[in-house]
Structures are given as C-alpha cells and as structure tokens.
Swiss-Prot record:
It is found in: Cytoplasm. GO terms for cellular component: cytoplasm. It is an enzyme of class 6 (ligase). Belongs to the adenylosuccinate synthetase family. The lineage of its organism: Bacteria, Bacillati, Bacillota, Bacilli, Lactobacillales. This is Adenylosuccinate synthetase. IMP binds at D13, E14, G15, K16, N38, A39, G40, H41, T128, R142, Q223, T238, R302. The gene is purA.
Length: 430
C-alpha cells in the first residue's frame, strides 16, 4: 500500500501543484486533505497554464480518482466554477470525489472573514477573505454545515436558519453591518449541493480500500508547514494543518498507511501576506527574484515577499512533518546572480546562535540570519535534465541544500513545465 504525502515546507507557493502533478503519473488516487480555495496551484501542461484552487492536480488524469477529503472546507460556488473552468478547457471532472464529511463555506463565513480582518486595523493577518478561518471556527464550535447536511434539504434549512440568526446578530451589533437574507442563501446553496451530489461519497472508504488493494495514493497538501496553525508562525498562519500529520485527520486514513513524505521547497523563499520572514530581501536582488520567478499569488494576485533559502525553516519542516524526501524547485530563478546565499542559523542580539525556529515572534524579531555565501552561475539551466548537466556552481548549491536540510533530494526543477522536473530518486520505487 504505497502512499506519498506532498507538503509545502515554507510559506506556501513552493510548487506543490507542479510536483503533485508530476508524481500523479505513477499514482492511482490523488487526495486533498486540508485548506480550501484560499490555496492556489498552477500546473503547466503542454505549455498551457491551469490554475486550480480546490480540485486536486490529479484531475488531469481521467483514469485516476481525485479526492477532496473531509479536512477540506469547500466553497460550493467556487468548486462548481472550477469544474466549469476545467470543462471549458476540455478536462472532465468525472473522476472527482468529495467527502460527505467536508465542511461548507457559506456567504456569512466570507463576510465575517472580511469584517474581522478590517477590525484588526494595522494588525491584519493578511487573510485571503475566502471565509476559511470562520468556516474552521464553526467546525470546531460544532455548528458547521457539512456536505452531507447541504444535500439534505430539511437539515440544511434548519441549520442555516439557526446559524444565520446568530451571524446576523453579530454583523449588526458588533460590526454595524447589514444582515444577510436567508432565502437567497438557502436557495442558491441548496442548488449548488444538488449539482455536486453526484461527486459526494465517503472518501475515507475510497482511500482505505485503494490502499488495502495495493494502489498508489498521493496526498496533496495546501499552503505550507510555516502556515500550519500549530507549527507555523502563529498567528500569521492558516486555520488548518498542512503538516503531514494533517493527512490522517483530513482524509480518514490512519498514520500506519503513510509510506513517504515529500517536502517541496523553492531554491529561495517567498511568502504572501504579513508575518515574520527572517531572510526577506528588500533590494534589487529581491526584485529580480520576484520578477524572474513571477512571484505573484495565484489566489490573490498580490506580489509575494521573497528572500534567500532558509535552512532553519527547512529543518523545522523536516522535523515536524517527518520529511523523507525533498523536491527542490525554481533553481533556474537564481541564474544570473553573482552570488547566492543560504541562511544556516540565526543570531540573537546578544551574539548567541540558534539553529531552531523560535515559537515566540518577539524572540524571532531579535534574530538575524547568518548566511553562507556560494558562487552564483550565469548559464541558462532550463534545459538541464540531469544533475551533471547543471553548471558546477548550481550543482554545488543543490548539494549544499540537501546537506543543510538533512533530507535526500528526489527531484529538482529548472522551470515550470513537467519536462523540467528531473528525478534523482523515485519516491514510488518504480
């Protein structure tokens, strides 16, 4: 029962969709286990870009099953739009399966997300205003509406009416905002549920049956370890658990059935929104990396903050997600730089060096990155297909990253295309 988990090891946008798409060729089932349509991944097939937010990357393989697990919060409207977008581009969603236990994002979640963020003033977290956080809040408070509830007209009506009464009081009294109308939401979202009904099932059964039958299952994470609500840069995090441990909760598959964990990272670092970022660059080098790497959010369109590769962050990701392999992306973006840097440790203001990532943001603010500087390379490496074809400086950079993180590099990428992802070691054993 081979199974592989793909996790982002930084602050998201590491190229998980690309690696998941690449690994999907040897998988038979591909599953999302957390997050919602706040995450975006771009996949390039035959030079054409596809941007997905909810549907797993495996949807491009019609013979494979694509699963949206119970740990995902689903915006039915967004999901239907994504299915239509794929259909317009000749991609069928017939192989899609949606967990009946997944929770639903409703208009009051998005409205509350916006109002809460606005109320924070200059202390905003940088949410995508997709309603993700409020949906997970309702789930934890045991008042959420699940896909199974959405499909049952009587249950959906009862729970929506109850929830909307509470939310509307909050909108009016706490935020001085207009209430939402019940009938409009009820009719619209019940119809969405009926459109999605043919995809809905108990996905835990599908996943476990597949694994028990010896089929290869790929679990696709959203965001990254540093955005994990427990292990990330709290409170500048998402509302779910992107770490590998989130798979068991968000898919209904036990931990004994997980074989390998592939951490995906870029050869540099990026993040969207507010929060600590020790190696962030504000100079011309940072601007060059952003423009060459097209570092703008798939979901928000916001320019991403960029910085040097941080091995302190990566070792944290290795530890809390149990990484067995590493996929190193976007090495080509660093081409043309005279020198490249890797953060190897942090230094406190008192001169003490630390090699772990602090939980306290105050402690983190007192730290400065300690860099190891390596020679850069000027060559265009986008057509390189083996490690040996890379210029010596690029080859040394890749090796040094593996040494500092302490994880075997199984693939390296020199561009966005499938053909630009190069295998050093198969995680499937094939």
């Amino acid at each position: 029962m081979p199974s592989v988990v793909v996790v982002g090891t930084q602050w998201g946008d590491e190229g998980k969709g690309k690696i998941t798409d690449f690994l999907s060729s040897n998988a038979e089932v591909i599953a999302r286990y957390q997050g919602g349509d706040n995450a975006g991944h771009t996949i390039v097939i035959d030079g054409k870009k596809f941007k997905l937010h909810l549907i797993p990357s495996g949807i491009f393989f019609p013979e494979k099953i694509s699963v949206i697990g119970n740990g995902v919060v689903v915006n039915p409207k967004s999901l239907i739009e994504e299915i239509a977008y794929l259909a317009e581009n000749g991609v069928s969603a017939n192989s899609l399966r949606i967990s009946d236990r997944a929770h639903v994002i409703l208009p009051y979640h998005k409205k509350l997300d916006f109002l809460q963020e606005e109320a924070k003033g200059d202390k905003k977290i940088g949410t995508t205003i997709k309603g993700i956080g409020p949906a997970y809040m309702d789930k934890a408070a045991r008042v959420g509406i699940r896909i199974a509830d959405l499909l049952d007209k009587e249950i959906f009506e009862e729970r929506l009416r109850t929830n909307l009464e509470v939310k509307n009081r909050e909108f009016v009294k706490m935020y001085d905002s207009e209430p939402l109308e019940f009938e409009e939401i009820f009719e619209e979202y019940y119809e969405y549920g009926q459109q999605l009904k043919k995809y809905v099932t108990d996905t835990s059964v599908i996943l476990n049956d597949a694994l028990d039958a010896g089929k290869r299952v790929l679990f696709e994470g959203a965001q990254g370890v540093m955005l994990d609500i427990d292990q990330g840069t709290y409170p500048f995090v998402t509302s779910s658990n992107p770490v590998a441990g989130g798979v068991t909760i968000g898919s209904g598959v036990g931990p004994s059935k997980i074989s390998k964990v592939v951490g995906v990272c870029k050869a540099y670092t990026s993040r969207v929104g507010d929060g600590p970022f020790p190696t962030e660059l504000f100079d011309e080098v940072g601007h060059q990396i952003r423009e060459v790497g097209h570092e703008y959010g798939t979901t928000t369109g916001r320019p991403r903050r960029v910085g040097w590769f941080d091995s302190v962050v990566m070792r944290h990701a290795k530890r809390v997600s149990g990484l067995t392999n590493l996929s190193l992306n976007s090495i080509d973006v660093l081409s043309g730089l005279e020198t490249v840097k890797i953060c190897v440790a942090y230094e406190r203001s008192n001169g003490e060096q630390i090699t772990h990532y602090p939980a306290s943001l105050k402690e983190l603010a007192d730290c400065k990155p300690i860099y190891e500087e390596l020679p850069g390379w000027s060559e265009d490496i986008t057509s390189c297909r083996t490690l040996e074809e890379l210029p010596e400086a690029a080859r040394n950079y890749v090796r040094r990253v593996g040494e500092l993180v302490g994880v075997r590099i199984s693939t390296f990428s020199v561009g966005p295309g499938r053909e630009q992802t190069n295998v050093l070691e198969s995680v499937w054993g094939v």
